[in-house]
């Protein structure tokens, strides 16, 4: 079952990206290195509630 998730920057806490994840394959919160336009650098983004 795929669900929509929002990714937030760990530095500035801005919610920058929306994506889909498969809950069966990824039961935990996902983390990705993505570009944050507010920090103007690549930072770690975590799944939010």
Curated annotation (Swiss-Prot):
Pfam families associated with the record: Ribosomal_L33
UniProt source species: Clostridium perfringens (strain 13 / Type A)
One GO BP: translation
This protein's UniProt keywords: Ribonucleoprotein, Ribosomal protein
GO molecular function: structural constituent of ribosome
Similarity field: Belongs to the bacterial ribosomal protein bL33 family.
Record-linked InterPro entries: Ribosomal_bL33 (IPR001705), Ribosomal_bL33_CS (IPR018264), Ribosomal_bL33_sf (IPR038584), Ribosomal_zn-bd (IPR011332)
GO cellular component: cytoplasm; ribonucleoprotein complex; ribosome
Gene field: rpmG
Protein name, per record: Large ribosomal subunit protein bL33
